Amino acid sequence: MLHADDVMAGKMDALYNRAAARDFLDIDAAITVGRYTMDRLCELAETVDAGFDRAIFADMLRHIDRFDDEEFAQYGFAAAEVPALRARVAQWRVGFTPDQLGN
């Protein structure tokens, strides 16, 4: 049986490399329920992907804007909740410190 950390490392890898609408939803759910912080998720991603780069990841988070609200609805996410999702993802992005980004 997989440990939750292993599952979340895979979810972070998916968000980092594929960045599909469902990948944003998976990470948002893990953070929203309080099980993980973005910092912990990045640590997990770094354990499975030696090339994981927080600066690239932070920049990649803006790609959420390429999805229409309806694309999130395919996964049972209410369209009315999408603006709040986008705001949370923006907060993740600005939440990285210069030290975490290698600046």
Protein language model features and the residues they cover:
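Compositionally biased terminal segments of proteins
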Residues: M1-N103
